[in-house]
Structures are given as structure tokens and as C-alpha cells.
Design a protein with these regions (language model features):
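Surface-exposed cleft-lining segments at the edges of enzyme active sites
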Residues: 92, 156-163, 193-197
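N-terminal active-site segment of His-dependent metallophosphoesterases
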Residues: 20-103
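C-terminal motif of bacterial Sec signal peptides marking the signal peptidase cleavage site
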Residues: 15-18
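Hydrophobic helical h-region of N-terminal Sec-dependent signal peptides
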Residues: 11-12
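Extended active-site neighborhood of metal-dependent phosphoesterases/phosphodiesterases
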Residues: 36, 98-185, 203-216, 230-265
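Active-site neighborhood of phospho(di)ester-bond hydrolases with catalytic His/Asp-centered motifs
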Residues: 59-61, 85-91, 115-121, 187-191, ...
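Bacterial N-terminal signal peptides that target proteins for export
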Residues: 1-7
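Active-site-proximal loop/helix segment associated with metal-binding centers of metalloenzymes
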Residues: 26-34, 47-50, 173-194, 242
Length: 268
């Protein structure tokens, strides 16, 4: 049967209108807007901090589901003019849903200063890791601010059923020597700290030995447990500072100087 020519315009209008009614699957990794966010912001961090002898940065994490609190965090931090960058310790999503990553990216993009986001364990659910890689980049990455190297790691071993080397010791070993002439201090950041159940604790002590090979290791940062935590985990002088979740409306501010470092907790 031939389709009547007079009905073509009506059919075309219905087809176009129907396109707006298509509901994408929540795990479709259909990305709109900025991608490779960490790389773009790292370039800005390194440029802004070049030749600086004092670095001041914020750590926070676990903004999953707390959108209003995260938006308030951004507004609060934007009132300051003394922070160089932000490290988000991971878990921007609760269920690994694509839109969760996009919503959190758009909130964080309101910051007046650059930021990076680590991969959290909730970010690995469903197609979350794939979405994270598209929007933010590789889960293992590093950058240099002033003469401080920041090594950011995927430590979510349990989410991969131990099928991958997590933490990635090859990456760590390479980072010790990579651009070694450009830094003399180091900060290691992760979502899950050693001795948490989700960390690969079979290699916890090996992990600590590796990171202590970095020049001038200052301290480590983490998130994940939804409360603030400070402890010399291995009793070797290296402190671990764990950020609270955004629900509790606080974050860390670290200042690294030629003589050492200071930390404070800011509330909003």
C-alpha cells in the first residue's frame, strides 16, 4: 500500500516530535557537554602554580546524592581568593548513572578555580567507570603544582573483583621517576584508604612502601567513609586525612610551604 503524499508532512512532524520523547537508558554513557575534564583543569593548575613556593588546596568528597550541599560548597569556596585548586576524592555518583556524573560535573564547573575528581567505588557501578573515563579521564593520574607532585589513584579494588592490579604498582613505580627533576614533595590521593574493607589489604604494606619512595611524601588524602578521619595508619610518620561527605558540609584546606604543611577544616 502506498503512503498518501498528503500525510507525509503530518508524519514528519510526529517523527520529529517523537525524538524529544525518547528516554535514554540511565547507563547509556550518552555524554553531553565537557569531557576529559581532569586534563583540562590539570593544565590550568600547573600553569597557575608554576614557580609557586606555597600551595593551598582543598580536599572534599562523596558528593553523591547531596547536590544542594555540593552547590553550597561551590558558592562558599568561590568567596575565597586564596585557594589554588580542589581535589574531589570520588563518589560523585550513587549508582553509576550517567546523569549523576553530568549533574555533578556541571555543579563543580561553577568553581572559579580548577578541580580534579578521583574515581570512587560508587562511580564504578553499572557503566560508571566508562562514564567517568569519558567525562573526567583515566582513574590513575598525576600533576605537579609548584614543586609538589600529586599522585591520584584508583584504589577501589573490590569493585573490580581483584581482576585488575588495583592499586596499580606499575603506574606508581613510573610516577616516582616521571618528571623527577620538577618536584621534591609529594601528596598521594585516593578514594579508599588502606585497611578499609574495600582496599586490597593483601598489599597494604607494599603500597605504603611504594609511596614512601616518592620524594618528600607529605601526607595522603582519601574519602569514602562519610566522616572525617586523621591517622598515622602505618605508624611511620605519614598521616592519612579522610574527607567528610558533602552531607556534613565541611572540607579540608591544606597549605604546603617550604617548611612543611598545615591543615584546617572549613565549615559552610
Amino acid at each position: 500500500m502506498k503512503f498518501p503524499k498528503l500525510l507525509y508532512p503530518s508524519f514528519l512532524c510526529l517523527l520529529i516530535a517523537g525524538c524529544d520523547m525518547i528516554d535514554y537508558h540511565p547507563y547509556d554513557v550518552h555524554i553531553s557537554g565537557e569531557t576529559d575534564v581532569n586534563a583540562h583543569n590539570i593544565a590550568q593548575i600547573e600553569q597557575n602554580c608554576q614557580n609557586k613556593t606555597t600551595i593551598r588546596f582543598v580536599t572534599m568528597g562523596d558528593s553523591q546524592r547531596w547536590y544542594d550541599e555540593t552547590d553550597d560548597f561551590v558558592s562558599h569556596l568561590n568567596k575565597r581568593d586564596d585557594i589554588d585548586f580542589v581535589i574531589h576524592g570520588g563518589d560523585v555518583s550513587d549508582f553509576g548513572v550517567t546523569d549523576e556524573f553530568l549533574w555533578q560535573r556541571d555543579i563543580m564547573n561553577k568553581l572559579k578555580i580548577p578541580y580534579v575528581i578521583l574515581l570512587g567505588n560508587h562511580d564504578c557501578l553499572g557503566t560508571g567507570e566508562e562514564t567517568y573515563r569519558v567525562i573526567f579521564g583515566d582513574p590513575n593520574f598525576s600533576f605537579i603544582a609548584g614543586r609538589v607532585k600529586f599522585v591520584c589513584l584508583n584504589t577501589n579494588a573490590i569493585e573490580f573483583d581483584y581482576s585488575r592490579p588495583i592499586p596499580d604498582f606499575e603506574f606508581l613505580a613510573a610516577q616516582i621517576r616521571d618528571h623527577e627533576e620538577e618536584f621534591d614533595k609529594t601528596v598521594v590521593s585516593m578514594h579508599i584508604r588502606p585497611f578499609c574493607n574495600e582496599f586490597n589489604n593483601n598489599v597494604a604494606h607494599v603500597f605504603q612502601r611504594y609511596i614512601k619512595e616518592f620524594p618528600g611524601l607529605q601526607f595522603c588524602t582519601s574519602a569514602h567513609e562519610h566522616h572525617r578521619f586523621e591517622k598515622d595508619l602505618f605508624e611511620d610518620g605519614i598521616m592519612y586525612y579522610m574527607s567528610d561527605c558533602m552531607k556534613n558540609r565541611n572540607y579540608y584546606i591544606f597549605t604546603i610551604t617550604p617548611d612543611g604543611y598545615e591543615r584546617e577544616v572549613a565549615y559552610y
